[in-house]
Design a protein with these regions (language model features):
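Metabolite-binding pocket within alpha/beta catalytic cores that recognizes anionic/polar moieties
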Residues: 1-129
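Short, well-ordered secondary-structure micro-motifs
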Residues: 17, 96-97, 116, 159-162, ...
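Short, well-ordered amphipathic alpha-helical segments that serve as non-catalytic structural scaffolds
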Residues: 71-75, 131-135, 218-229
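Active-site rim beta-loop-alpha module in soluble metabolic enzymes
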Residues: 118-174, 178-187
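His/Asp/Glu-rich mid-to-C-terminal helical/loop segments that flank catalytic regions of hydrolases
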Residues: 201-238
Length: 238
């Protein structure tokens, strides 16, 4: 496995990775499109990182599935990676044993929790069930958890979303993994999602408040795991 590409939504999540791996910005890599690309040779590998970019009107990071699809497609078509790592923050549940700052690796498949198409065939297509690599060989080495990543287009969650998560087994709730997984599946490129928990859905506290309060801690934990995946050559065991 020579080429690894990180797909990261937010610049705040990406900056420690850029510093650690000595990644250099590739100016104008995608023309006028928002995603930004970085590259370096590190530990006998080519490391790439693509962020969703900044929306000009607000100055904020692009988030969500649409931005993630664009970033993932541009990354794959430009760099042809051997492995995609979708690194970011996510929510989870106290009832499932999660705590703030826990890091999860995707397991089994990646799904969507807010796509409801009750027509045979399209129902499963909408939910996704997109492939990801089996992380069980490395979980014990880096003291992380594993779970099914599930994506939606909102930071909060509805009762219908929760019901679909029960049906699919989704647990680690974010806004990008499903989109990246879809692109990876089209190109038949192995995918690993690495998600650090910023908020607990059933903790009784506001999701935006939890996200803002815990983003720094979660990002530190996230990046530490991503460092180890490369530095300790754990990606070669996937």
């Amino acid at each position: 496995m020579k080429k690894v590409c990180f797909i990261v939504a937010m610049q705040g999540e990406a900056k420690p990775l850029i510093r650690h791996f000595g990644l250099h910005h590739i100016e104008g890599c995608f023309g006028s499109l928002p995603p930004q690309a970085y590259r370096a040779s590190y530990a006998e590998k080519e490391i790439f990182l693509v962020t969703n970019g900044i929306e000009q009107e607000t100055g904020l990071d692009y988030i969500g599935c649409e931005a993630a699809v664009l970033s993932a497609h541009l990354a794959v078509s430009s760099f042809s990676p051997d492995l995609i790592i979708n690194a970011g923050t996510a929510g989870d549940f106290v009832s499932k044993g999660a705590e703030i700052g826990d890091v999860y690796l995707s397991n089994k498949y990646v799904v969507f929790h807010d796509r409801r198409v009750p027509i045979p065939g399209w129902d499963k297509m909408g939910q996704g069930y997109l492939p990801c690599v089996d992380p069980l060989n490395i979980i014990s080495e880096i003291n992380v958890k594993s779970g099914v990543c599930t994506s939606g287009s909102s930071l909060d969650i509805t009762g219908d979303d929760l019901e679909q998560m029960k049906q699919t087994g989704g647990e680690v709730k974010d806004m990008e993994a499903g989109a990246v997984a879809w692109v990876a599946s089209l190109y038949n490129i192995p995918l690993l999602c690495v998600k650090a928990i910023t908020d607990l859905v059933d903790a009784g506290h506001s999701t935006p408040e939890q996200f803002n309060d815990n983003f720094l801690l979660a990002t530190q934990r996230l990046d530490d795991v991503c460092f180890r995946l490369i530095d300790e050559k754990l990606v070669d065991k996937l």
